[in-house]
C-alpha cells in the first residue's frame, strides 16, 4: 500500500472521475487497494483477450476500451457507471509513461465524460513507478469541475478546453507528488 498524501482533497460526497499518471501495470491495483467502494477503470481492450481474462478484469470493474479509434460503447458504459453514482478511474495518457516526469499527450475522453456526467475530476499522481517493498507515494490533488462550461454545446474547441484542464491539473498534481512545487 502506498503512502497517500492529500486525502483531504477527496470529495466526501458524490461521485467523480479520477485521472492519474500511468507508470506501470500495477497502477490500477495500487489505486484499487485504497478504495472501499466500487471503482471502475478504463482498461485497454487487449487485457480482455480470453474468456478468463474478460471475467477476471470485469470482476474488478475494468471497462475495455479500444485506444486506436473512438470507442462509443466504452464511453457509453463509463457514462452509465457515473450516472449510477460510481467513480471512474482513467489514465488519460492512454498508455504507460516510461519517462517518469512530464505527462505524455493527454487523450480527451476523461474530460468529455466528466463534463457530460457533470461530475468533478480528481487528479491522482504516483510519485514514481510502483515497486513492491519500496517507499511508494500517491498524491491526491484538488478536485475541479467544468461547471463554468455547462450549457455550452460540445465542439472540438470545447473538447480541447476540457482536455487542457485535465493536463494542467494533472501535471500540477504530478509536480507536487514529485516535490517540484509545494501544495497550496
Where are these regions (language model features)?
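Residue-level marker of motif borders
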Residues: 1-3, 22, 88
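A generic structural signal for alpha->beta connector loops
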Residues: 1, 36-38, 59, 85, ...
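Catalytic core of membrane glycerolipid acyltransferases/transacylases, capturing the structured
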Residues: 10-69, 77
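Non-catalytic C-terminal accessory region of glycerolipid acyltransferases
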Residues: 75-184
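Short, flexible active-site-adjacent loop segments at beta-strand->alpha-helix junctions, enriched
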Residues: 8, 22-23, 35, 45, ...
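Alpha-helix initiation/capping motif
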Residues: 46, 64-71, 103, 155, ...
Amino acid at each position: 500500500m502506498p503512502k497517500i498524501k492529500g486525502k483531504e482533497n477527496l470529495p466526501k460526497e458524490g461521485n467523480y472521475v479520477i485521472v492519474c499518471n500511468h507508470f506501470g501495470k500495477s497502477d490500477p491495483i495500487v489505486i484499487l487497494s485504497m478504495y472501499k467502494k466500487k471503482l471502475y477503470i478504463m482498461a485497454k481492450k487487449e487485457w480482455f483477450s480470453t474468456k478468463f481474462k474478460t471475467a477476471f478484469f470485469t470482476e474488478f470493474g475494468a471497462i475495455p476500451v479500444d485506444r486506436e479509434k473512438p470507442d462509443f460503447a466504452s464511453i457509453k458504459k463509463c457514462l452509465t457507471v457515473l450516472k449510477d453514482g460510481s467513480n471512474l478511474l482513467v489514465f488519460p495518457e492512454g498508455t504507460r509513461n516510461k519517462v517518469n516526469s512530464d505527462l505524455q499527450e493527454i487523450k480527451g475522453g476523461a474530460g468529455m465524460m466528466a463534463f457530460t456526467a457533470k461530475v468533478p475530476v480528481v487528479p491522482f499522481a504516483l510519485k514514481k513507478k510502483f515497486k513492491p517493498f519500496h517507499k511508494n507515494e500517491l498524491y491526491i490533488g484538488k478536485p475541479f469541475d467544468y461547471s463554468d462550461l455547462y450549457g455550452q454545446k460540445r465542439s472540438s474547441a470545447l473538447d480541447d478546453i476540457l482536455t487542457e484542464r485535465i493536463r494542467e491539473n494533472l501535471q500540477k498534481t504530478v509536480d507536487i507528488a514529485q516535490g517540484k512545487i509545494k501544495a497550496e
